[in-house]
Amino acid sequence: MRSLFKKFIAIMTLSTIFITSANAVYVYRYQQEKTQWCWAASAQMIGHTLGRQVTQTDIVTQVKGMDINDGANDTEMKNAVTYATLRNSVLRSSAWPFASATNELSTGEPFLIKLTWYKNGETNGAHAVVASGYNIASGTLTVVDPGYRCGTKAFDYNSMITNCKFQSGTGKWTATIYV
C-alpha cells in the first residue's frame, strides 16, 4: 500500500511539473490574404483571440489609409495591433526574454513577433507571426505563421533570437508587440 501511495505522489508531482511548464493560448490561424499582409493577419489573429472580429482589409485601410498590398514598419504593426484589439499596444524593439514571453502567454494574451530575415549577413526583409504558447522544459515558443503553406509550430527560443529556420524563412526575432 505504501509503495502504491509513493507511486501516486510521484505521478502527481510529475503531472504538476508538466502542467505548469507548458501553456498554450488558442489562436485561430488566419492566412495572410495578400503577399505583404503578414502583419495584418497577425494583428487579426491577436484581435480575434481577444474577442474582436476585424478583417485584414479593415486593418490595412485603418493603418495605411487605403487597401494596398504593402508591408508595415514597426510603428504600423503596433497601430495594427491597437486597432485589431481596441487596446493600447506596446512596441519593444527587440526580442523578449524567455521569462517575459512565458509570463505574457500565461495571462492568455498572444503577442506579435517581428522576424527579420538575413541573407549573407544583410537584412533581407521581415515577417510577422504570433506567439501562442510555450514549453519551459524544452525551451520552446509556439508560433502561428500566417504565411502561405505555414501553420503552428514550436521553435527553440535561443535559436529564435539568434538565427532560426522558421516556416517562412531564416532569420531572428527582432521586435515584439503586445497588449
PLM features: residue spans?
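Bacterial N-terminal signal peptides that target proteins for export
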Residues: 1-12
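Conserved active-site-adjacent core of cysteine acyl-enzyme catalytic domains
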Residues: 47-49, 58-179
